[in-house]
């Protein structure tokens, strides 16, 4: 990396300007108090922000109004005093400072600042990356679909947003681990095995002889797996299961043997399919964690013993280990309340961690898993983020309570994000696409219809906390109404500008970035300056969809700029030369730039290109060179 490139490493122009404005105003206030212009007092809390209206400067502050009570003067007088005591702004990122209205202080950024934005984006291929997170270790667990069947649209949405959140946290300066928790133990696997075993017996004896219980998995994928197993092993497992009632069958050793054999066959295939589909979906996990290892290693028993030691659990008379859910319920929300027949909620009750027969519940494994994330030998997490589906609301309270029982801080060391439902629509109607999985629309279905780019972008641009309808017809369209097309087209357009500029012999040589002085230039520059802060905010708020929304705003600004200004000079038409002098001059600047301005615009074009490419990469979406 060159010294020039190092200058723009972890460069956040917007935050740097806000910090400098705060420092200048703080210094001015201290100077005004030191010479008696303002009475000595503790500096009041004040705001430094980007104003909504560009007429109010690039940065605005309410220090004068916030200090009216402190300094016992009118805000306008305070503002004038502060400006009079400002250190010289020569050599700073500001060109002028003004007082507006009742006492707002407005600061205007210098042309050298805006030049730095362009230079930073062009010089640093990772413009937008900062050290905001200071290397704190974050574990982001997302998707974690049960390996008992295909992944559905909720998993697709969780995958798009989870992977983007992990990428945004990484770029915001956090040390991130992407993790998938494989639920390969417990009741779900027992139900999976039972479903497979019944479907296997049906292969030879028919559905009437062995009807599939309602609580079993009904999807066509179960039939396929059972059929494959039957082709390999024939009817070897059928005879030992005959001649029993349903109750006797399900309790028999023969049925247990069949279940285990089917799970041993089908589970690895399903896990491999999960990994394959997520790979096609461009998600690359750092850790695939098997729930079964928690039981095999003794981690579940160890964590239950620890909770007993901490007093968060106790042993009931029947020998079961009970978790003190009731005492945590009020503080951390619903833990295990249930609706009664009249619609009211029962009081929270303590929960079973280990049954009287010594078998732990799934919650015990969840506790052991959290403990492992926080204390594992490699990549232990300062913060464990769980991205869960809409059916997990009741999970939050018990997990937060467990976090507190370990002495951790709920909401800080453990953070749980709940995603809402997603519906696939076409022509305003719900779509059923999958033959293999019954009524489930799978990730593979979606990708096969609209492609990875459209699937990931559309699902990543929506707030995780809101229900979302995905429109297949819109995603397949090549129109500006399709958000992924709109953003990708901006990138492709910028590449076309590069090709046309090269053909015309235009390069960066001789670029005068001070000539990026039109209104359209200013709008693009302001948008570019926001990118690192957008990523930091998206990381802090755990709202990765903000990246997509920002890209759409940047693309709109760029398309507007592209339609107004030219990099490759174009002579004015005869009618355009007949306007008044001011209009003709504006058109000349826009359409027929001098070499220094054309070169500067090429740099601005390429800065936009880099930011869009970076943003799309964070979303797991490609940045095409042509469209």
Predicted regions and their residues:
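Non-catalytic interaction-recognition regions
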Residues: 2-115, 123, 129-627
């Amino acid at each position: 990396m060159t010294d020039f490139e190092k200058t723009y490493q972890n460069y956040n122009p917007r935050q740097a300007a806000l910090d400098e404005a705060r420092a200048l105003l703080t210094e001015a206030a201290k100077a005004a108090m030191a010479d008696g212009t303002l009475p000595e007092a503790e500096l009041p809390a004040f705001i430094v922000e980007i104003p909504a209206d560009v007429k109010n400067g690039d940065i605005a502050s309410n220090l004068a109004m916030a200090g009216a009570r402190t300094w016992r003067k009118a805000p306008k007088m305070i503002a004038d005093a502060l400006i009079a005591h400002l250190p010289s702004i020569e050599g700073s990122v500001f060109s002028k400072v003004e007082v507006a209205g009742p006492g707002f202080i407005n600061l205007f950024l210098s042309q050298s600042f805006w030049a730095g934005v362009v230079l930073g984006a062009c010089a640093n291929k990772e413009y937008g990356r900062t050290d905001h997170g200071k290397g704190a270790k974050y574990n982001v667990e997302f998707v974690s679909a049960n390996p008992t069947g295909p992944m559905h649209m909720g998993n697709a949405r969780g995958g798009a947003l989870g992977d983007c959140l992990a990428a945004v946290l990484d770029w915001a300066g956090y040390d991130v681990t992407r993790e998938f928790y494989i639920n390969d133990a417990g009741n779900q696997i027992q139900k999976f095995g039972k479903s497979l075993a019944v479907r296997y017996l049906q292969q030879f004896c028919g559905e009437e002889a062995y009807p599939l219980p309602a609580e079993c998995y009904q999807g066509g994928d179960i039939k396929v797996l059972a059929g494959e197993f039957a082709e390999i092993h024939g009817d070897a497992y059928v005879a030992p299961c005959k001649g029993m009632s349903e109750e006797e069958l399900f309790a028999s050793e023969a049925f247990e043997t069949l279940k285990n054999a089917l799970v041993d066959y089908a589970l690895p295939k399903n896990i491999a399919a999960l990994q394959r589909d997520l790979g096609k979906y461009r998600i690359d996990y750092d850790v695939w964690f098997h729930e079964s290892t928690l039981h095999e290693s003794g981690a579940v028993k160890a964590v239950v013993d620890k909770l007993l030691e901490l007093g968060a659990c106790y042993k009931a008379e029947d020998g079961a280990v009970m978790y003190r859910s009731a005492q945590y319920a009020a503080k951390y929300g619903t833990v295990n309340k249930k609706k009664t027949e009249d619609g009211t909620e029962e009081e929270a009750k303590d929960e079973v961690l280990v049954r009287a027969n010594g078998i732990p519940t799934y919650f015990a494994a969840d506790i052991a898993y959290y403990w492992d994330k926080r204390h594992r030998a490699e990549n232990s997490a300062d913060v464990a983020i769980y991205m869960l589906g809409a059916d997990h609301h009741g999970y939050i309270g018990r997990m937060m309570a467990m976090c507190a029982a370990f002495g951790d801080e709920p909401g800080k060391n453990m953070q749980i994000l709940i995603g809402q439902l997603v519906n696939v629509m076409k022509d305003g109607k719900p779509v059923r696409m999958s033959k293999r999985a019954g009524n489930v629309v799978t990730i593979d279905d979606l990708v096969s219809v609209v492609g990875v780019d459209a699937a990931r972008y559309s699902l990543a641009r929506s707030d995780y906390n809101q229900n979302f309808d995905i429109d297949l017809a819109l995603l397949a369209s090549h129109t500006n109404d399709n958000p992924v097309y709109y953003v990708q087209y901006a990138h492709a357009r910028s590449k076309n500008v590069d090709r046309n500029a090269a053909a015309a012999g235009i390069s960066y040589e001789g670029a005068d970035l001070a000539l990026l002085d039109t209104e359209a230039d200013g709008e693009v520059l302001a948008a570019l300056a926001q990118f690192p802060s957008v990523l930091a905010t998206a990381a802090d708020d755990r709202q990765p969809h903000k990246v997509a929304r920002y890209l759409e705003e940047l693309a709109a600004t760029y398309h507007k700029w592209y339609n107004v200004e030219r990099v490759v000079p174009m002579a004015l038409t005869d009618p355009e030369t007949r306007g008044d002098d001011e209009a003709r001059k504006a058109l000349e600047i826009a359409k027929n730039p001098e070499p220094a301005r054309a070169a500067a615009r090429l740099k601005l074009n390429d800065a936009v290109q880099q930011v869009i490419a970076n943003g799309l990469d964070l979303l797991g979406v490609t940045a095409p060179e042509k469209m």
